[in-house]
C-alpha cells in the first residue's frame, strides 16, 4: 500500500551558489558521512560533478521528506537520510538514528529515482507500507 509520494526538482545553480558562499559547511550540513566521502572524491576529480552530486542528494532527501509527509522536521534531518548507490547502480536510501526507528516502526520501504542534467537535479520517491 502506498504511504506517500514525493518529488523534487533542484536548481544546480543554487547548490553551486551555496557551496561558493558557505564552502564545505553547506555540504557538511546536507550530506551524511558516507556521502561526504564520495562528494570529496568526486569534487577532487571534477568539481562540477561534485556540485551535481550534492544537488542530487539534496533533491532526493527533499523528495523523501515529502513522501513520508513530514518535511524537514524531526526525526527527519539531512544527515539521518543517506542516499547510496547499489552495486546495480540503483539509488537507495539508508536511514540512521531516530528516523530509522520511526520508519521501521511503521513497516515502510522506499523506492527512489534520481537524475541530473547540467542545470537541474530531480528525484521521485515512493514510500510504501510492507504487507
Swiss-Prot record:
Enzyme class: transferase
EC number(s) on file: 2.7.8.7
Positions annotated to bind Mg(2+): 8, 62
Reaction(s) catalysed (UniProt annotation): apo-[ACP] + CoA = holo-[ACP] + adenosine 3',5'-bisphosphate + H(+)
Protein's cellular compartments: Cytoplasm
Keyword Transferase on entry: yes
Cofactor(s) of this protein: Mg(2+)
Keywords: Cytoplasm, Fatty acid biosynthesis, Fatty acid metabolism, Lipid biosynthesis, Lipid metabolism, Magnesium, Metal-binding, Transferase
Entry's Gene Ontology molecular function annotations: holo-[acyl-carrier-protein] synthase activity; magnesium ion binding
Top-level taxonomic group: Bacteria
UniProt keyword Lipid metabolism, yes or no: yes
One of the protein's GO biological processes: fatty acid biosynthetic process
One GO cellular component, as annotated: cytoplasm
Family listed: Belongs to the P-Pant transferase superfamily. AcpS family.
Function: Transfers the 4'-phosphopantetheine moiety from coenzyme A to a Ser of acyl-carrier-protein.
Record's protein name: Holo-[acyl-carrier-protein] synthase
Organism: Delftia acidovorans (strain DSM 14801 / SPH-1)
